[in-house]
Regions:
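Conserved alpha/beta core of the MobA/IspD/sugar-nucleotide pyrophosphorylase nucleotidyltransferase superfamily
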Residues: 1, 158-225
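N-terminal nucleotide-binding beta1-loop-alpha1 segment
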Residues: 1-17, 197
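Conserved N-terminal catalytic core of the sugar/cofactor nucleotidyltransferase
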Residues: 2-5, 25, 29-96
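A generic "binding-loop/recognition-motif" signal
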Residues: 10, 19, 54, 204-207
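Phosphate- and divalent-cation-binding pockets in alpha/beta enzyme and binding domains
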Residues: 13, 57-60, 79, 106, ...
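Conserved beta-strand segments of alpha/beta enzyme cores
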Residues: 22, 66-68, 148, 197-199
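The conserved acidic donor/metal-binding loop of glycosyltransferases
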Residues: 99-102
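Conserved core of the sugar-phosphate nucleotidyltransferase
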Residues: 104-183
């Protein structure tokens, strides 16, 4: 299984404690290294890290953990641009994840096993509303219907799940992003959802956290010990 890890952005909300989210130390180990360790534990053998801001340093961590890298020179653009940078290397199916989301191997295994011929992507969702690790003011909200994404975004008023930041994707996603100008990943997800090609899989039995600010970093460090 291939995994594409988006690690190009600047991550301004953690700048007070770290110069770069992927390089942030979580209990003494770089966040990106922990993500790659958990991917390996889940059986992922072909990780590809998309670098950008502080790319040489991020690439050094990725290479030390056994991953390949690809630099996105437009790293200051929305994250859909990093997905498009990976398009020439994208396999028929791949995990797609964010370098600021730390997930247990069970999350990756569950999403990797959720492929279906009637979907161009599958998003891992968490239905544990009110979980203390979730930042309700910032988490991406998902409204689902019959196992598919009906709506997705940070400002939804009606929703029944959180986006855990881990997808199983196919080239349908990059095809949806390609015509757009400086797209975000969610733009591609919405395009597939409009065609009923965006499915979901429940990962609520497994833990994950979006390490987006000092509070979340403290929670993550307590989790990994």
């Amino acid at each position: 299984m291939q995994a594409i890890i988006l690690a190009a952005g600047m991550g301004t909300r953690l700048r007070s404690v770290s110069p770069s989210k992927p390089l942030t130390l979580v209990a003494g180990r770089a966040l990106l290294h922990r993500i790659l360790d958990n991917l390996r534990a889940a059986g992922v053998t072909r990780p590809l890290v998309i670098t950008g801001y502080r790319g040489d340093e991020v690439a050094a961590v990725a290479h030390a953990a056994g991953a390949e890298t690809l630099h996105n020179p437009r790293w200051d653009q929305p994250n859909g641009v990093s997905v498009l940078a990976a398009a020439p290397r994208l396999e028929a199916q791949a995990l797609l994840l964010m370098a600021d989301h730390l997930a247990s191997p069970g999350v990756y295994r569950t999403v990797a096993a959720a492929g279906r011929p009637d979907a161009g992507l599958v998003l891992g969702i968490d239905r544990r509303m009110g979980h203390p690790w979730a930042d309700e003011a910032d988490v991406t909200r998902v409204s689902t219907r019959a196992g598919r994404i009906a709506a997705i975004g940070k400002t939804l008023n009606t929703y029944d799940a959180h986006d855990c930041g881990v997808f199983l994707v196919t080239p349908e996603l990059t095809a949806a992003l390609a015509p757009l100008t400086a797209p975000g990943l969610s733009d591609g997800v919405r395009a597939l959802a409009a065609r009923r090609r965006a499915a979901v899989v429940d990962i609520s039995a497994h833990d994950w956290i979006d390490i987006d600010d000092p509070r979340a970093l403290a929670l993550a460090e307590a989790w990994v010990g």
